[in-house]
Amino acid sequence: MNQFMLLGFIAFGGAFGACARYLISELCVVLLGKGFPYGTLTVNIVGSLIMGVLMSSLNQGIIEAAPCRPIIGLGFLGALTTFSTFSMDNVILMQQGEVIKAGLNILLNVTLSITACFIGFQLMKS
């Protein structure tokens, strides 16, 4: 696969990931309100679960690396999940004096995202 085609695959996946992130974030606001960054937490957990499934599937040869890895791993998941928004959410919470909420958000994002990735990986091993 040439580099131009690879970039096209990544952009294709990224377009869907960005749209999914927006829709999930908006849905979280409607369902859960604006008092906590539920949207960022949700996309990071879901993205980590998908990454675990993807990597386990690639390792086992269930799916072929090209073009799945660049489309899903780099494009879709790169646009869906975000560390910069996670960081900004916590800075805003701390600036608002919501130190406990910021700590809870950090704990939940890190713990649940890693757990979801592990679960996704294990699901594909069985």
UniProtKB/Swiss-Prot annotation:
Swiss-Prot/TrEMBL catalytic activity: fluoride(in) = fluoride(out)
Keyword Zinc-finger appears in the UniProt entry: no
Bilayer-crossing regions: 4-24, 35-55, 71-91, 104-124
Record InterPro entries: FluC
One GO term describing the cellular component: plasma membrane
Binding site residues for Na(+): 78, 81
Subcellular location field: Cell inner membrane
Keywords tagged on the record: Cell inner membrane, Cell membrane, Ion channel, Ion transport, Membrane, Metal-binding, Sodium, Transmembrane, Transmembrane helix, Transport
UniProt KW Transport keyword: yes
Coarse class of the protein's main subcellular location: membrane
Residue runs in coiled coils: none
Pfam families reported in the protein's UniProt record: CRCB
Membrane topology: Multi-pass membrane protein
Described purpose of this protein according to its UniProt entry: Fluoride-specific ion channel. Important for reducing fluoride concentration in the cell, thus reducing its toxicity.
Stated name of the protein: Fluoride-specific ion channel FluC
Species for this entry: Aliivibrio salmonicida (strain LFI1238) (Vibrio salmonicida (strain LFI1238))
